Amino acid sequence: MWTIMIGSKNRAKVHALQEVVIRDKIIVRSEAVPSDVASQPFSDQETIQGAINRANHCLSFDGVDYGVGLEGGVVRSEYGLFLCNWGALVSQTGDQWVAGGARVPLPQEVAHELEGGKELGDIMESLTKNPDVRMTDGAIGYLTDGEISRKAMFQHVVHLLIGQARRDGHLLRTVTH
């Protein structure tokens, strides 16, 4: 049995991991750990680094076999600002896997506020009038009119991470699905 720690107490992120590994003999723990990047990552590189940093911080806790970091950010393109999300899975043996997920263009008014220094989560709270939006639908829920939740978006990334690890002989299933 393995223990995986996710470097966040955010319910959307924690539940994303729990629901992906629920049928496996894996213990999921969560702790708030720093990303060591800006509170609003503004590139793929910074968002990836935040996810890797969170995952690595998890390995410093006793009894943790694998660490997971999930990080949301924004990225500039010739088509405007896009929402991005990245994840990292690291093992105590030094292995590391990285995966990214959905990209959705941000409305011009949201991009303008981001460029002015606001955090996406704060902007979404204001737009949705939901102080809990980071734990529920997130920006992706707003941008897709509820078709995709933040949890579902991060579940996709977790599936990509776990799948890569299993391909490499880690976290092999111990129960039949």
UniProtKB/Swiss-Prot annotation:
Keywords, sorted A to Z: Hydrolase, Magnesium, Manganese, Metal-binding, Nucleotide metabolism, Nucleotide-binding
GO biological process: nucleotide metabolic process
EC number, UniProt record: 3.6.1.73
Keyword RNA-binding attached: no
Keyword match Aminoacyl-tRNA synthetase: no
Catalytic activity: XTP + H2O = XDP + phosphate + H(+); ITP + H2O = IDP + phosphate + H(+)
Source organism of the structure: Halalkalibacterium halodurans (strain ATCC BAA-125 / DSM 18197 / FERM 7344 / JCM 9153 / C-125) (Bacillus halodurans)
NCBIfam families per UniProt: PRK03114.1
Pfam families, per database record: NTPase_I-T
Quaternary assembly: Homodimer.
Role summary: Phosphatase that hydrolyzes non-canonical purine nucleotides such as XTP and ITP to their respective diphosphate derivatives. Probably excludes non-canonical purines from DNA/RNA precursor pool, thus preventing their incorporation into DNA/RNA and avoiding chromosomal lesions.
Cofactor section: Mg(2+); Mn(2+)
Protein's name in the database: Probable inosine/xanthosine triphosphatase
Classification via Gene3D superfamilies: 3.90.950.10
Cofactor note: Binds 1 divalent metal cation per subunit; can use either Mg(2+) or Mn(2+).
Family per similarity comment: Belongs to the YjjX NTPase family.
An MF annotation (GO) of this entry: nucleotide binding
